[in-house]
Swiss-Prot record:
Keywords: Cytoplasm, DNA damage, DNA excision, DNA repair, Excision nuclease, SOS response
Protein name as annotated: UvrABC system protein C
Family membership noted in the UniProt record: Belongs to the UvrC family.
Disulfide bonds: none
SUPFAM superfamilies: GIY-YIG endonuclease, RuvA domain 2-like
Assembly with partners or alone: Interacts with UvrB in an incision complex.
Role, per record: The UvrABC repair system catalyzes the recognition and processing of DNA lesions. UvrC both incises the 5' and 3' sides of the lesion. The N-terminal half is responsible for the 3' incision and the C-terminal half is responsible for the 5' incision.
Species, as recorded: Borreliella burgdorferi (strain ATCC 35210 / DSM 4680 / CIP 102532 / B31)
Every GIY-YIG domain range: 17-94
Gene3D superfamilies with a match to the protein in the record: 5' to 3' exonuclease, C-terminal subdomain, GIY-YIG endonuclease, UvrC, RNAse H endonuclease domain
Amino acid sequence: MKENLTNLFEKVIKLPTTSGCYKMLNENKKILYIGKAKNLRSRVKSYFLEKNSHKIKILMKNVKSIEVITTNSEYEALLLECNLIKTHKPDYNVKLKDGKGYPMVRITHEKYPRIFKTRKIINDKSEYFGPFTNVKKLDQVLDFINKTFKIRKCKKKSNAPCLYYHMGQCLGVCYKENLEKEYQKELDKAKSILNGNISEISSQIDIKLKHAIQKEDFETAIKLKEIRNSLIEINQIQIVTKTNNLNIDYVHVHPGENVNTIIVLKYRNGKLVERDANFDESICKENELILQFLIQYYTSINMIVPDKIHIFLKDIDTKNVEKLINEIKNTKTEIIYKETEEILKIMEMAISNAELSLREYENKSTKALESLKIVLEMDKLPKIIEGFDIAHLKGQETVASMVTFKMGMPFKENYRLYKLNSLLKGEIDDFKAIKEVISRRYSEIINNNLELPNLILIDGGKGQLNAALSILKGLKIENKVKVCSLAKKQETIFLTTNKKGINLPQGHPALRILQNVRDEAHRKANGFNKKRREKITLLYTKIHGIGEKTAQKILKSIGTYKDILPLSENEISEKIKVNVQLAKRIKEFAIKENSIKNNNQDK
């Protein structure tokens, strides 16, 4: 590794000092990370420092080459970086996972507005109230408001009264005419409550509560008391700030050991309406992370850009990011940083929200793992899961992937890709492929005295499970690690202790974890196989007279250059339906490639 980094560094110190973008690639030419820089040489050199974080060191362990694209300005570099990340989606760049924000109340912009709970803001002149942290109490209040003020529930106009009208919970606006004034009067009362004016309605509830107690109608009394308490609570938690009625987002980055949390507190007309939590596993530093986040978040199709975006990081040049957002979204937003007593309070709230969101995120994973532990009859929590998948195209370029999940989340630093050698050309044998990859992975662990995972997941059914188990038995570790398989069609979980298999309902937290691991392993294996095939196809297009279609035909019908070597020119011609002259060039190319490879091995 040190030798590789030394060779890389020698190339890096020769990079231009202009602005531009850099791509970090692994040995298979897969892009791991994309960044931009004002000074390419200076920025890329910083990745070789000893004081870098663990994540950056893991990245650099896998980097085998660095490519750069120079630009005329820093803004052009930013624009290029944005496009490259969207195109390639590198593993080590920012990939946001949305957290579930607290719900709000939406009053629609219609002739007869409806009132309901939502987690999305739509720019259609609707009014929003909230957010509300206690969903149960919010549901109680909304139910009370809708019934008391007879708010419309139906989405479409009808020729007949709805069920709610017959129950006395609707004015009948779905079929009656000219009720605008009467409806608006009731709607204003509902809005008043949502704005925190609850003294009048609380007094009315208290009177009803006393009557219910006098009549010994304790069931009604309990319900009325719950509604009154819910009204008081939900109107205490709405936090208002003096923002001169502007729409402002406050963005806070909360770095974590494995997961970074980015909180967006959204204020509309001076009132906090939403807390949006996002989670990121990239290697980006705090300054770089917030800039990448702002671009991805605010340039997405459905995102409404506010008047101002306030960040809590000082001395960051956001002019280019601001310009890019405004150009893409046709807005006039400002990205600002200020220090006032009021903003410091908002910052404290953002930090506590970030910590809360991270705990919720981690707790969700822990509960799912507890569920998985019970389903698989494990003694310990499956904190570390390693998942395997095989990929090939009609027996060509068979490869395997191994992914690692720690506490239910991808741990990309530990991913592995394998070129399999035990299968013959055109041979399709998942069992043999699984045996090879399991043998290679766990021989490596035993030989290097590394930690075993708690759970091994194989993509497949009983046969694939037994193939893996036979290798684990040979290595004498079958009792040290739990192993299971997940069959695709029925999503059946197979265990060595359960021959019939386990079928969990869709959405079950234990099944969801296994599906996530399986799907990630599948994605990595297929991606690796595709890259291998593309590399070979590209190689064949260097032969004079060979286009992409013929190159693909060579790959499918014959295979790699090694598979071409034993064939005669006539055999090549017959297999891929080309003339003998072209077949001769293909044969010569294969001999030349083989000679180059042999010479490289001798050095």
